[in-house]
């Protein structure tokens, strides 16, 4: 019974963590979200873009006595840039997403077992006498439950990151519409620039998550060792610590991605 519980906990955790890679590259809802954005958000974004352009015209008119033809040309060019940006924003975001997906696909996790296998622990438990097995029941249940919860939390974070990407795709026309605001002062509008960095950070987040999983897959085998003094209880605690450390790294990966891109 204890052997089945431990095996199930390890297998479930390893499978969940491996499945996170599939979740992070899932774009099945992309087209639906884009279509919804075009019908709901795009008209609002066009209105905002026009208001921003009119505001820029008024600000320019206040600074000069007459609006020269050069200023008119700049306004028309700016209007064209905003219009093209609104039209091409899904393709820009898709290109950023595809780059991250390509990187994630290169980090194959199908054969990655962050906790390794439970054979050594099971062999140790099978060698225990019945009283010792009965005493070990509660610790085994608690630690196995903790391992599974840690795996589910990692999968939850992966789905959360996917929803974050899709929400950004849905609202994308709104921050792009502010591109014209302040453009006469040079550079990209702060709202637009912030949005692009946040979206890129969300894409990078998935890649960093997979890097964390790969790193732990490489080093976890040296962490959990049934031969270390303390017996099966210490070994199970080591396994739980590995799962929780992995969870902590995955949680922290979001802030790492944002700090890299200053988002």
Task: Report each predicted region and the residues it spans.
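Hydrophobic transmembrane alpha-helix segments characteristic of membrane transport
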Residues: 48-80, 171-187
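Short, well-ordered alpha-helical packing segments
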Residues: 45, 58, 73, 77, ...
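Binding/recognition "hotspot" determinant
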Residues: 1-49
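Hydrophobic alpha-helical transmembrane segments
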Residues: 42-54, 142-149
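Alpha-helical transmembrane segments and their helix-start/interface "positive-inside/aromatic belt" motifs
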Residues: 65-89, 192-202, 257
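Alpha-helical membrane-interface segments at transmembrane helix boundaries
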Residues: 33-42, 77, 93, 126-129, ...
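Non-cytosolic segments of integral membrane proteins
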Residues: 81-173, 202, 206-262
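Alpha-helical transmembrane segments
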Residues: 177-197, 229, 259-261
């Amino acid at each position: 019974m204890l052997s089945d519980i431990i095996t199930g906990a390890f297998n479930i955790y390893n499978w969940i963590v491996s499945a996170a890679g599939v979740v992070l590259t899932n774009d099945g809802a992309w087209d639906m979200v884009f279509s919804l954005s075009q019908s709901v958000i795009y008209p609002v974004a066009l209105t905002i873009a026009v208001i921003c352009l009119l505001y820029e015209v008024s600000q320019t008119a206040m600074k000069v006595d007459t609006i020269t033809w050069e200023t008119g040309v700049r306004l028309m060019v700016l209007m064209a840039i905003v219009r093209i940006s609104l039209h091409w924003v899904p393709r820009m975001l898709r290109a950023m997403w595809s780059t991250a997906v390509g990187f994630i696909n290169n980090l194959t996790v199908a054969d990655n077992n962050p906790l390794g296998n439970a054979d050594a622990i099971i062999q140790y438990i099978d060698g225990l006498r019945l009283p010792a097995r009965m005493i070990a029941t509660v610790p085994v249940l608690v630690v196995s439950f903790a391992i599974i919860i840690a795996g589910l939390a990692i999968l939850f974070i992966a789905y959360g990151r996917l929803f974050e990407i899709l929400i950004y795709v849905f609202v994308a026309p709104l921050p792009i519409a502010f591109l014209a605001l302040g453009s006469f002062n040079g550079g990209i509008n702060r709202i637009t620039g912030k949005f692009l960095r946040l979206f890129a950070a969300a894409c990078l987040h998935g890649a960093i998550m997979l890097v964390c999983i790969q790193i732990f897959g490489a080093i976890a085998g040296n962490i959990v060792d049934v031969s270390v003094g303390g017996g099966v209880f210490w070994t199970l605690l080591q396994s739980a610590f590995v799962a929780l450390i992995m969870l902590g790294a995955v949680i922290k990966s979001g802030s790492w991605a944002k700090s890299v891109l200053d988002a």
